[in-house]
Amino acid sequence: MSTPDAQPDPEVYEQGRGMDAHNEVMREIRGRRDRTYDPREPTRVWLDEDNTPDGVYQSLTIILNTGGCRWARAGGCTMCGYVAESVEGGSVSHEDLMTQIDVCLEHEAENADEESGLIKIYTSGSFLDEREVPAETRRAIAETFADRDRMVVESLPDFVDRGKVRDFTAHGLACDVAVGLETATDRVRHDCVNKYFDFTDFEAACDEVRAVAEADDADAGVKAYLLLKPAFLSESEAVEDMVSSVRRCAAVDGCHTVSMNPTNVQRHTMVEDLFHDGGYRPPWLWSVCDVLERTADADAIVVSDPVGSGSERGAHNCGDCDEFVQTAVKDFDLRQDPSVFEEVSCECETTWAAVMEREKSYGMPLTR
């Protein structure tokens, strides 16, 4: 684990990207973590339902506990706390990673009536980064789930190439590469999220995946992950950035799904420090509805999964309507029908409208 004075590994992209100040703060914050983690236990595993180009599937979502995101070793993203839950030491063995997969399969067997058709695998960084997940492990995981229908694997665009995608499609699996783009606006991604790559890098990753689909007649595509209301944006700025970003992603060949997710306040992050100091409020659930409703005609599946919704640290409204609004969001995810939002209303929508009109980034948040 790095200390506040530790110098970042020069191979993790910090130098020359103008992000030294953010990274210095992030390294200090991450140095406060006070727990260790078992390399044989996944960070998270759960069952859900997801909309895909082939319809709605029961899904098994796995967050593998790896040695941590390469970018996070330099400082990393302002909102991401997963690296603080990573195993110390920088790597997890193939054997331990496969034990984590076994734990997830046991969870599925105990809690589901049938096997999930969709498997979603994430790490605290990039599943396709071979320093996090060795090629041997990636191929073994592909073989383990070869009898399922579809797999989603998350990666930064740097690590996306045709050979890695083919490790999955060669088994007849539909493969989606999920890219944490966060926003289509480079300045917001750099200055608010502290993420180093550009939109053109996302487009290049889409090209790699699309090339496999076209050359091999395979089912392969890209799922863009966007972030609603990163640090330093007002509510209205965040909403407008998301509407624009959803449309730009949907216009990229090969990107068939856009998952627009509101920021939640995770431990050991810059966002958490701002939150405790009164300088950050997670987005309103009304903002989630607004973005989904305004982009329902985009040429892609557009979904949202507000983690921690209804809590102080997650997207929330007044508290009275949160559960009903979250249900409408989930209904939209599965049906892609914006009329579901006409069925929910609350007096707090007036407060949200005032925040949208009056909140400025230098004086936020107007409400908690």
Residue ranges and their predicted role:
Residues G125-F127, P157-F159, T183-T185, L228-F232, ...:
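Active-site-proximal loop/turn and secondary-structure-junction residues that shape catalytic pockets
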Residues T200-T269, W286-P306:
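Conserved C-terminal portion of the radical SAM core fold
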Residues R40-T99:
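Canonical Radical SAM [4Fe-4S] cluster-binding loop centered on the CxxxCxxC motif
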Residues L105-D113, I141-A146, K164-A174, D207-D219, ...:
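Acidic (Asp/Glu)-rich catalytic clusters
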Residues S91-H107, V133-I141, F197-A204, A238-V246, ...:
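Well-ordered, non-membrane alpha-helical segments in soluble/globular domains
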Residues M1-G31, A250-V252, T257-S259, T263-R368:
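Auxiliary Fe-S-binding modules of radical SAM enzymes
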Residues G81-Q100, C104-V133, T144-V160, A174-F202, ...:
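Core AdoMet radical
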Residues R131-R139, D161-A170, S236:
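Distinct, well-ordered alpha-helical segments
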